[in-house]
Amino acid sequence: GDVYKRQAERMYHNFPQVFRGDAFIDARSSTSLRCAMSMSYFTERLKELNPGLQVNRRAYHRYMDYIAYTSPEGEKFASEKAPWRRSFREFEKKNVRPERLMASLFVKPEAITDQDAMMRSLYWIAADMQNVELDLSFYDIFEYEELVGVWKTVNARMYVCNAAAPLNGGLMPRCAVPLLRNILESADAAIEKGTPAADLRFGHDTHLIRLLALMQIEGCSNQEVDMEKFHLAWQDYRVSPMGANLQLIFYRDKKNNILVKFLLNECEVTLPLKSKMVPYYSWKEVETFLAEIIGKE
């Protein structure tokens, strides 16, 4: 929860004009308890900083059609029976090398029937221990090359199943079309009505990755056909670390023009659009660009 509280605090202080007075904040979440709790931590911190804020929090099933949508074709592509999984399993076998690790941990390593699975499980335990307040690490049971090998397989799967990998033919990023459409509609409504001051969505990393690839956010839509080079083109920890977030910050200039800036994980990023004011873009031009992406059915 501390991750989201700190994010909320930074957002509050970075954009004080948004969260002043009795501003209305609309927050929606996936029905996943984890996502709903993230929404709660984030918005409660905003309320602590300004008790006058009017915050509407919802986690309804009807929002799942855009917050966490995967098309039937996408589900089939990502399934364990998909044709691409055959070459991926060979890639896994090449990169997940458990022999040394098992021998270092167990007197009788041959008793471990699935050593690859054991190594992956230990990898995830080591990774997840970063999320608890223990002054202890399991990473030291691995050699550097072993960690890199397992990560390459994790990264490759995330890239193929969610990002702009040519292997999925754009199928997976297009699962984010409903979410992008909701963003455009919500932005236009807020610009016209002047409310809500902030429109917040709390969802899942895979769906954020798809959205970023679809929008062609800087560094998020790189393409590579060689599985051995996926890690050079796209890195999951850069695109979607713990608490990953995309922020669209809107500004109105003295001529009443609407500008927008994009922050990925609270860092300024660009779109493949020309602008004399980068990282600021004309909202009209951005909206046209994104609407064209949505229209490519």
Language-model segments: residues:
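Signature for phosphate-centric chemistry
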Residues: G1-D2, R6-D26, S30-E297
